[in-house]
Amino acid sequence: VAGLVPRYREPGFGLARLTLLVPSSRAARTLSEAFIRHAGENGESGLLMPRMIAVGDLDLDEKLGAALDPLGAADIPPACDPVARWLTLDGLIAEERAAEGMEPLPGRARLNLAREMARTMDRLLVEEKSPEDLWSEPVLDQLGGLAVHWQHAIRLFARVNARWQAELAMRGQVDAATRRNMLFDRAARRWKEAPPPHPVVAAGVTSAALALARLLRVIAELPQGAVVLPDLDRDMSAEAWDELGRAGAADEPGGAVFAADDA
């Protein structure tokens, strides 16, 4: 906060023109409180806050699309309701187990399995993996004696997932994780083609999501963009600091804070 305020505050606008991408809603609240404390400690009666967008949570609400791309978010298919997905997966699991001649699961156990399958689907979508990757040779080698049981479980998962994807296509919907990836990729393309006229900073955002990583790469290369990674080692050697370039420090007052060759 102490670095963002002097760098991005503008007379009459405060930080209102700054877009700040943060990992979660909790981080946004913490930063809001930090901005307020900073203003009070510096004897300021008030400060226009930056626009903060939580991008790290998997279960993001519909505000993400409007925040990143207000003109194009409507072109992306809507996300399915998570409860509807959970209950649909429950029914698909029962049908697929019956088709395989397996013993029926009690209702609660089947719902728990449906919840775990939904989480696995989300993780695969976030990391842009397919169900086939779960029974690749490197994975099976790690499982040892459990490999046969694993293959049976993955076959059930693959069948349920295939039917669920067909159901989504029929509804004209996508999983929430898929929609999030599409929103990130659309924002990355638009910002790369037409950089926003205001500063954009991603602060403390780390994720296994490849789409989010692609967006962060674009932000880092924007004329007024920056990516602030967490856990910066303040005890790095002078050689490491030199490799970082300006690291956000202008050579002269009012000068550029980042150079093209900065790490």
Spans of features found by a protein language model:
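Nucleic acid-machinery interaction/catalytic patches
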Residues: 1-263
